[in-house]
Each structure stands twice: as structure tokens, then as C-alpha cells.
Amino acid sequence: MLALVLGAVSPQAFAQQPAASSAVSTASQDVATRAVTRSTPAAALADRQLFYVAGESTMLYNTPDDSRPVRRLTVTTPVQRLSCEDEWCEVRTDDGKQGFVPETAISNIWIRASKADRRVYMYRGTRLMKTFKADFGYNAFSDKERRGSTSLRDHWRTPEGQFYVVRRNPNSQFYKALVLNYPTASDARRGYRNGIISRSERDAIIEADERISMPPMNTELGGWVEIHGDGTGAATNWTQGCVAVTNEDMNTLWWWTQVGTPVLVE
């Protein structure tokens, strides 16, 4: 499903690189339990068997072939992976329905972006695979509340919370970009409660959240928050709210992530 190869580095070689720690620390497991998508509440990806539908929606089948479809599973749908064989995986949904999906239709890759550490961490389930230095918003200490501007630089903030990659942009002005689903439904409710956006704007954002589609980006809450390239590699604060990594690191993230990849920003 992912077609981009990182130069001469194969995904197999990357997967064999040692994690930051040979064993997953308790702290990493605690973080993993908070790495959730909109649809994945508590167990999150700390469970080695918990995956999610990635890239695009997929069909759940009764048998490990495409002859007996059961239902369509949307992107970000959490599933428990039971076993895999011959490019098919047996999975169980949250409501207990069991069936088969193509092995390439699910993933357990997720991202944690730490404003305090100025780092981006990439995990596969509970395993920390890679750490990247990252640049964050001009105001590195506060959560995002509204759109920033040259006259409101304090509001150039990186939003905190649970997001997912809603779009991948290979032609970004910042090399490549993973667009996050900010503002989320919770951002919209808070913005409406605080008088920042209108009722219709709130409802449009909530509707997009429910459809698992790109939310409106033109309200006073701001938008187009991305993990993108052209970062300094020096862990500074200069963006208007995005997370910037070097282009080399962006290539790595681009290879491993898909639409639906969970992103925890804290």
C-alpha cells in the first residue's frame, strides 16, 4: 500500500534497527495507552494485537478471500488482530464481529509528538522505533485555541490532543506533509462554547469528524496543522503551529504512516 522507498534503505532493514530501549518501558506503555484515534478509546495501541484500518476503508470478509463480504470498515476503525496467513489477517471488531481483512489494510504504527521534549516519536504498537528532533509552534507552551497571525503570534501554537492523519500531501511547500484532523469535534465544541466559532461552523466540524474526513480549515479555530518537512533539525520553535522535521526524517515518517495513522500531541 505504501509505494515510497527510502532511498537504499528497505523497510526490512529499518524494522531491524534497535529501538531506543531493548524493552518497552512502563512510561512508553503508559504513553501507548493514550495513543488513540477518534474511534479507539482506552486500550489503544499498547495492546500488541490492537491495530486500525489504515490508508482507505476496507471490507471485512467471512473467509480469507474476497468472496463473502460482511461489512465495510472505515479508516481508523480499531480491530484486534488475531492471526495472519497468506496476506490475510483474521480480526475482531469492537462489537465482536470476527472476519478477515487484507494484511495491508491494517497497521499499528502511531506517532507521539512531545512539545516539552521537542521530539517526534514513532511507535509500532508498544515498540519505540525511531525518535526525531522536531520544531514546534512559536508559542511552545500553550494549547491552541484559535487561529494565529502576524499580529497574534502568541496563537501560533501546536494543538494538543488525539489526532490522526487525514491527508498526505506529497507536494507540500514544506517538502511533504501529513495533515492532521485539526480542528476536531472537541475543538469545535470548545470553540463554540467560548464564542470563537458559530453554531454552523461547530456543526460542520463535528460532521466532518463523524465522517472521518477533512474538517473545515478556514474558521477562527485555525487549521492545516501538519507534520511536515523543512525542519531545522535543531528542535526550535518557529512554525505557525505545525510540527517540522528534517526532510530525511520526513521521508521515514512518510514511508511508515498512512491516512488514519494516530497522532498524539502533548
Model-based region annotation:
Residues S67-R72, D154-H155, L253-W254:
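Short, surface-exposed secondary-structure edge patches
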Residues M1-V9:
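Bacterial N-terminal signal peptides
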